Amino acid sequence: MRIPITLLQTYFSEPLSTKEILEACDHIGIEAEIENTTLYSFASVITAKILHTIPHPNADKLRVATLTDGEKEHQVVCGAPNCEAGLIVALALPGAKLFDSEGQAYTIKKSKLRGVESQGMCCGADELGLDELQIQERALLELPEATPLGEDLATVLGNTSLEISLTPNLGHCASFLGLAREICHVTQANLVIPKEFSFENLPTTALDMGNDPDICPFFSYVVITGISAQPSPIKLQESLQALKQKPINAIVDITNYIMLSLGQPLHAYDASHVALDSLRVEKLSTPESLTLLNGETVLLPSGVPVVRDDHSLLGLGGVMGAKAPSFQETTTTTVIKAAYFLPEALRASQKLLPIPSESAYRFTRGIDPQNVVPALQAAIHYILEIFPEATISPIYSSGEICRELKEVALRPKTLQRILGKSFSIEILSQKLQSLGFSTTPQETSLLVKVPSYRHDINEEIDLVEEICRTESWNIETQNPVSCYTPIYKLKRETAGFLANAGLQEFFTPDLLDPETVALTRKEKEEISLQGSKHTTVLRSSLLPGLLKSAATNLNRQAPSVQAFEIGTVYAKHGEQCQETQTLAILLTEDGESRSWLPKPSLSFYSLKGWVERLLYHHHLSIDALTLESSALCEFHPYQQGVLRIHKQSFATLGQVHPELAKKAQIKHPVFFAELNLDLLCKMLKKTTKLYKPYAIYPSSFRDLTLTVPEDIPANLLRQKLLHEGSKWLESVTIISIYQDKSLETRNKNVSLRLVFQDYERTLSNQDIEEEYCRLVALLNELLTDTKGTINS
């Protein structure tokens, strides 16, 4: 779309420079560029205002003028008779190239005239090659008071236009009024409605035309008699030509100009070809051919919106009128129509029959429904200026325009989450009101009424974008927004820790083939998903994929596999599917010794140690960790268990069943653990990391051996002591567990080491002995019920 800068300036309370207009368009999100169709022989000549002048100290006929271009001041020596303060003139800067009366080029330089420095030259019209504008000999070219300062003179004098491209969400900018309104929102200028669009409203008469409300909820027209197809005034023709519109006749030119100015398409019919009593808008029931205004004959498919009467089709609704009933050279009575077509209806029509037109461009993006009648009234006033004797009927209207504005709630917390910056409700209200919205503060949000011309505002995120328009993109005080979710950060930190600790990270696919899934021998319901010809099942455990990868590595002469994987496993619970973020650790023994050193052996406790190291790394206390027996078919029946934290199942671990390892073609023992990272992430959210200083006083310890039944976990004794709340008991460590298989009693000896510590003083033997005896007494109560004894 093309808009002359001079025409756009009439909508602003104060002139804006071309740079300001371009910056405003960029801020709005409009692609804009300047197009100048007039060529001048000068360059580097700008507009400047004379602030003040003083007589030249060494020359009676010269004056020293101080000028401003809006940003910088310039001192120029000038001899023109009209060099006075307050004038806006043409200032040639050093480096500017001008031409003399003989056509010879010369360059303006910074120089001294009679001892006073001159930083350029104030130009007369003849010095710029604009002899027709020279009104007095040796006089300066005087520019209008509204001329913006610092602008290139060629841009100011030339036929300069703004060429813009609109995205589909900016339909409200597809007119002079709409674009000027948006520019005013992001600049300091106020919107001014030109005088030709300021008038009293005309009376309207309601009709029931039977229009399809799903296509055209509002339709209006006026009948004007006593007009002709005479040319429009020269000024209007020049305006249309600057807009790349071909002048046709007064009536058609007025409808086109109002569409470009206000954004409301109008159409003029020859009244003798329209049956007003049956005029309506509806969907075409059967395909018909129609010759359009552009002379093209098209076959209209059924379902497209049309304007018609009982006798003929009058046009393709919202797109283009038919040629036969259009305004003719012989027309003396016209029907001018203005309507509101729903954007979704016109978009559907354009898919069925894509015919580009200025009307379709605006209707598909959405026009202001409350501007339909005012645009028709503007056309009437324009016509009366050209045809004062014309007779005007009342404005007839059918349908209703929804006067209720859309309401959308905006919450400050949404802006904080998305932009990383907090706004009060009062500030949000001020910003949105400056953009033309009405606001009502609520307790925790702002209720925003959307103007009728803003079809792009439908939900909260749209208002967030509007707030972005009021903010600089270079917000230095903006709080950094975390880009990662807690579970993502946990997975990265865990992977880094395990890799640094010596494990290798494996990556296996989520989709497995049925043969690999069968390795786990689980009886869970499988989730099928066709990934390729062979991979059809989503994994319910990381074990099958890791077993297959481990076997591949061992078969390629890897001495052992010490690996981990972090991935998603899938489970089905009834009709619902659940995804769980999981960590798996897989360890295998070395196949053979490669040196004189003995082979490092692996056991169930090696695997448990890795889990405990991981928890310790994440600052989780292993005191809350309990190991319970399990009966999972994937593991060795006597070397497996379930780890629980606060009674929640957190991990399964053990030696992979030998038959399963053999089935996977692995000859050596395999140990496997699978941890629920989602549960671990929830625990970390509840964990408070506190600094614990190093002790500066020595600690003391006592060793204790207990005889307990073999089914009592040693860790139970340890936790019993730690949970008693002793103020000096620093730690309890299991030293050894011994069981004599030759004895008939099924007991075992558990040796514990109790460390006592005070961070404020050195404990005496008496303090330690008293606390030790108290803890032993507590254990005696526990062992009395289990027939255990304390040996030392």
From Swiss-Prot:
<keyword id="KW-0479">Metal-binding</keyword>
<dbReference type="GO" id="GO:0000049">
    <property type="term" value="F:tRNA binding"/>
</dbReference>
<dbReference type="GO" id="GO:0009328">
    <property type="term" value="C:phenylalanine-tRNA ligase complex"/>
</dbReference>
<keyword id="KW-0436">Ligase</keyword>
<dbReference type="InterPro" id="IPR041616">
    <property type="entry name" value="PheRS_beta_core"/>
</dbReference>
<protein>
    <recommendedName>
        <fullName>Phenylalanine--tRNA ligase beta subunit</fullName>
        <ecNumber>6.1.1.20</ecNumber>
    </recommendedName>
</protein>
<feature type="domain" description="tRNA-binding">
    <location>
        <begin position="39"/>
        <end position="154"/>
    </location>
</feature>
<dbReference type="GO" id="GO:0004826">
    <property type="term" value="F:phenylalanine-tRNA ligase activity"/>
</dbReference>
<dbReference type="InterPro" id="IPR036690">
    <property type="entry name" value="Fdx_antiC-bd_sf"/>
</dbReference>
<dbReference type="Pfam" id="PF17759">
    <property type="entry name" value="tRNA_synthFbeta"/>
</dbReference>
<comment type="subunit">
    <text>Tetramer of two alpha and two beta subunits.</text>
</comment>
<dbReference type="InterPro" id="IPR004532">
    <property type="entry name" value="Phe-tRNA-ligase_IIc_bsu_bact"/>
</dbReference>
<dbReference type="InterPro" id="IPR009061">
    <property type="entry name" value="DNA-bd_dom_put_sf"/>
</dbReference>
<dbReference type="InterPro" id="IPR002547">
    <property type="entry name" value="tRNA-bd_dom"/>
</dbReference>
<dbReference type="InterPro" id="IPR005146">
    <property type="entry name" value="B3/B4_tRNA-bd"/>
</dbReference>
<feature type="domain" description="B5">
    <location>
        <begin position="403"/>
        <end position="480"/>
    </location>
</feature>
<keyword id="KW-0460">Magnesium</keyword>
<dbReference type="Pfam" id="PF03147">
    <property type="entry name" value="FDX-ACB"/>
</dbReference>
<dbReference type="InterPro" id="IPR020825">
    <property type="entry name" value="Phe-tRNA_synthase-like_B3/B4"/>
</dbReference>
<keyword id="KW-0547">Nucleotide-binding</keyword>
<feature type="domain" description="FDX-ACB">
    <location>
        <begin position="695"/>
        <end position="791"/>
    </location>
</feature>
<keyword id="KW-0067">ATP-binding</keyword>
<dbReference type="InterPro" id="IPR045060">
    <property type="entry name" value="Phe-tRNA-ligase_IIc_bsu"/>
</dbReference>
<keyword id="KW-0694">RNA-binding</keyword>
<dbReference type="GO" id="GO:0006432">
    <property type="term" value="P:phenylalanyl-tRNA aminoacylation"/>
</dbReference>
<dbReference type="Pfam" id="PF03483">
    <property type="entry name" value="B3_4"/>
</dbReference>
<dbReference type="InterPro" id="IPR012340">
    <property type="entry name" value="NA-bd_OB-fold"/>
</dbReference>
<keyword id="KW-0963">Cytoplasm</keyword>
<feature type="binding site">
    <location>
        <position position="466"/>
    </location>
    <ligand>
        <name>Mg(2+)</name>
    </ligand>
</feature>
<keyword id="KW-0648">Protein biosynthesis</keyword>
<dbReference type="InterPro" id="IPR005121">
    <property type="entry name" value="Fdx_antiC-bd"/>
</dbReference>
<dbReference type="GO" id="GO:0000287">
    <property type="term" value="F:magnesium ion binding"/>
</dbReference>
<dbReference type="InterPro" id="IPR045864">
    <property type="entry name" value="aa-tRNA-synth_II/BPL/LPL"/>
</dbReference>
<dbReference type="GO" id="GO:0005524">
    <property type="term" value="F:ATP binding"/>
</dbReference>
<feature type="binding site">
    <location>
        <position position="456"/>
    </location>
    <ligand>
        <name>Mg(2+)</name>
    </ligand>
</feature>
<feature type="binding site">
    <location>
        <position position="462"/>
    </location>
    <ligand>
        <name>Mg(2+)</name>
    </ligand>
</feature>
<dbReference type="Pfam" id="PF03484">
    <property type="entry name" value="B5"/>
</dbReference>
<keyword id="KW-0820">tRNA-binding</keyword>
<feature type="binding site">
    <location>
        <position position="465"/>
    </location>
    <ligand>
        <name>Mg(2+)</name>
    </ligand>
</feature>
<dbReference type="InterPro" id="IPR005147">
    <property type="entry name" value="tRNA_synthase_B5-dom"/>
</dbReference>
<comment type="similarity">
    <text>Belongs to the phenylalanyl-tRNA synthetase beta subunit family. Type 1 subfamily.</text>
</comment>
<dbReference type="InterPro" id="IPR033714">
    <property type="entry name" value="tRNA_bind_bactPheRS"/>
</dbReference>
